[in-house]
């Protein structure tokens, strides 16, 4: 129990407080404009009827405070400490989707658009977010018809003897082959940036000016090109409705019922709705502190920061958060709580989205709860398998051997729990020993600092399962369920040319005969999906290592090629195919590769006996 006499000694200054349990574990990290007032509010006599105060008073044994000079410093420190300690009762900002952005670096030679998972802090411009890679690719596909920017890395383009197919389709201006001037290409890139930012009126105004200038200079082909661009842009955007001005705005909606809290963010770019992002939050504090913690955590990650953030109610740290985001973005960002007008309607719309997401998620989870309950019953599990981990091994004749781990939480992939393991200690093709190494590395300190799964699934039969159970016993990890999933087998009866496929089987510890689940039932489909995902994850890593190794093996025996030059060639060309396509001049362009050595490399890659350079 926390000694409330300490409350009078707390400083009346901005800073961060860390609430700790009996074992010294950090339960919650918060920030405050005044540490004394904020922490005292949790223990005030008039507040004990509120759940979050009863919750804290009952569990907090000690509170540490760190004083900062400003609220903005407190905000930064809070985020750092949350990332470091991951307290049980702070928000965990995970959603069930991966989002993508388009990246455009105007400082590149001939700027190119690429799809990235996370915006970086590298001076490039980022547009989005998009809910899937396919959505981002569709935007690119349509964009290239208006703005034919290059599709491939410059090194790849310049190795080609002629422009790529996209040039023939008029979806690439082929700058790498000198078919467009640098000035005109830069104009295309600037136009693409304006279009993606929703600045269509600015873009058409700019192109009208250039069309008029080209016509005045009797450059009629250029004038016609600008005319066609203006028409195409107007046709593209004429059906889009502008509802949020012409800037970039994030609208935050907030919904709470008796048991759950959800947040929805609507992304408006150039005044048009581009997409949304939803979160279901495990939060036991009051709404204002919940929203404050959410905003702080979300916008201190690698996300696109807009001009304006609309929020459903005011929070204490609106001003310092706005200052911090302005500093990170390099442009002014403001947080507003609109109470009337169009922007207030947008906030209410976001709240309705948050409510709809909560009901949809709850309905989906209830269905998955039934599937997990059926798995527990059919496989005689100790635990309801909310967190399932699956392991797989990938190797070819003992070379480039790797292991993988995937994690599913409540029936959905939890990408933060995916891990790859390069096999270090096992020579040859001993799959059992490789699995032993992977599992030992995972659980070497009891739970690997990554929490305990309810159920472990491995691909294979009774042999693989025996390895797993032996490791769990060896490490003293009791109470974790384990099963192995054996793929169906195909058998051919040669006499009547009949093909028979056996059922997939689940092996359990201490039981000789496997359990056969209904083949199209949801429990087996879930296990098979997890098993296949672990296999995909392992084989992707294996192929990556094998691709790197193929370059190295192709260069073995060439005089003058050591590990350093192998790394440089691998970095420059990326694959053995690209390396073989390179001519002598391109090979000699690699640092530390002389013309004579380039000739030796080229001969070795094309089946000729290399000579000492």
Swiss-Prot record:
InterPro entries documented for this protein: GIY-YIG_endonuc, GIY-YIG_endonuc_sf, GIY-YIG_UvrC_Cho, RuvA_2-like, UVR_dom, UVR_dom_sf, UvrABC_protein_C, UvrC
Entry's Gene Ontology BP terms: DNA damage response; nucleotide-excision repair; SOS response
GO cellular component, one term: excinuclease repair complex
Pfam families recorded: GIY-YIG, HHH_5, UVR, UvrC_RNaseH, UvrC_RNaseH_dom
All residue ranges annotated as the UVR domain in the record: 201-236
GO molecular function: DNA binding; excinuclease ABC activity
Family statement drawn from the similarity comment of this UniProt entry: Belongs to the UvrC family.
PANTHER family associated with the record: UVRABC SYSTEM PROTEIN C, UVRC/OXIDOREDUCTASE
Function: The UvrABC repair system catalyzes the recognition and processing of DNA lesions. UvrC both incises the 5' and 3' sides of the lesion. The N-terminal half is responsible for the 3' incision and the C-terminal half is responsible for the 5' incision.
Protein's name according to its UniProt entry: UvrABC system protein C
Protein's organism: Geobacter sulfurreducens (strain ATCC 51573 / DSM 12127 / PCA)
């Amino acid at each position: 129990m926390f000694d409330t006499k300490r409350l009078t000694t707390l400083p009346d200054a901005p800073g961060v407080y860390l609430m700790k349990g009996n074992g010294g574990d950090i339960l919650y990290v918060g920030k405050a404009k005044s540490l004394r007032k904020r922490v005292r509010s949790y223990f005030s006599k008039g507040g004990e009827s509120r759940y979050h105060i009863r919750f804290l008073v009952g569990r907090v044994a000690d509170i540490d405070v760190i004083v900062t000079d400003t609220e903005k410093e407190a905000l930064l420190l809070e985020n750092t400490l949350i990332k470091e300690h991951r307290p049980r009762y702070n928000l965990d900002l995970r959603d069930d989707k991966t989002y993508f952005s388009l990246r455009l670096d105007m400082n590149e030679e001939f700027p190119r658009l690429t799809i990235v998972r996370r915006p970086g802090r590298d001076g490039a411009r980022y547009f989005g977010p998009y809910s899937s890679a396919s959505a981002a690719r569709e935007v690119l596909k349509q964009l290239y018809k208006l703005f034919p920017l290059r599709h491939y890395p410059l090194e790849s383009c310049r190795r080609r003897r002629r422009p790529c197919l996209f040039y023939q389709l008029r979806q690439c201006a082929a700058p790498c082959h000198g078919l467009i001037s640098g000035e005109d290409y830069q104009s295309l890139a600037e136009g693409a940036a304006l279009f993606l930012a929703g600045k269509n009126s600015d873009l058409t105004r700019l192109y009208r000016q250039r069309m008029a200038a080209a016509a005045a200079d009797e450059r009629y082909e250029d004038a016609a090109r600008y005319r066609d661009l203006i028409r195409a842009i107007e046709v593209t955007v004429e059906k889009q409705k502008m509802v949020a001005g012409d800037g970039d705005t994030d609208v935050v909606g907030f919904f709470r019922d008796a048991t759950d809290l959800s947040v929805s963010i609507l992304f408006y770019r150039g005044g048009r709705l581009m997409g949304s992002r939803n979160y279901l939050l495990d939060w036991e504090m009051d709404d204002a502190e919940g929203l404050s913690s959410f905003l702080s955590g979300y916008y201190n990650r690698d996300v696109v920061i807009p001009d304006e953030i609309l929020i459903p109610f005011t929070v204490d740290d609106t001003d310092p958060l706005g200052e911090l985001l302005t500093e990170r973005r390099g442009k002014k960002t403001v947080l507003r709580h609109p109470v009337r007008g169009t922007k207030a309607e947008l906030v209410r719309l976001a709240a309705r989205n948050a409510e709809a997401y909560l009901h949809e998620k709850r309905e989906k989870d209830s269905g998955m709860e039934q599937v997990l309950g059926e798995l527990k019953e059919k496989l005689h599990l100790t635990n309801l398998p909310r967190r399932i981990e699956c392991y797989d091994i990938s190797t070819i004749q003992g070379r480039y051997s790797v292991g993988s781990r995937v994690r599913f939480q409540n029936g959905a992939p939890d990408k933060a729990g995916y891990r790859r393991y390069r096999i270090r200690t096992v020579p040859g093709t001993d799959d059992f020993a490789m699995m032993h190494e992977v599992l030992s590395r995972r659980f070497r300190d009891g739970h690997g600092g990554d929490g305990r799964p309810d159920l472990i699934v491995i691909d294979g039969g009774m042999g693989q399962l025996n390895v797993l159970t032996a490791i769990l016993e060896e490490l003293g990890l009791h109470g974790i369920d384990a099963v192995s999933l054996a793929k169906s087998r195909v058998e051919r009866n040669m006499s009547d040319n009949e093909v028979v496929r056996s059922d997939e089987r689940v092996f359990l510890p201490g039981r000789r005969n496997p359990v056969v689940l209904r083949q199209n039932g949801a429990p087996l489909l879930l296990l098979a999906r997890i098993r296949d995902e672990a296999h995909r994850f392992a084989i992707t890593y294996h192929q990556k290592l094998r691709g790197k190794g193929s370059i190295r093996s192709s260069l073995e025996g060439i005089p003058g090629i050591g590990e350093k030059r192998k790394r440089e060639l691998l970095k420059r060309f990326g694959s053995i195919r690209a390396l073989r396509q390179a001519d002598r001049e391109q090979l000699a362009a690699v640092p530390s590769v002389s013309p004579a050595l380039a000739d030796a490399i080229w001969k070795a890659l094309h089946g000729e006996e290399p000579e000492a350079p």
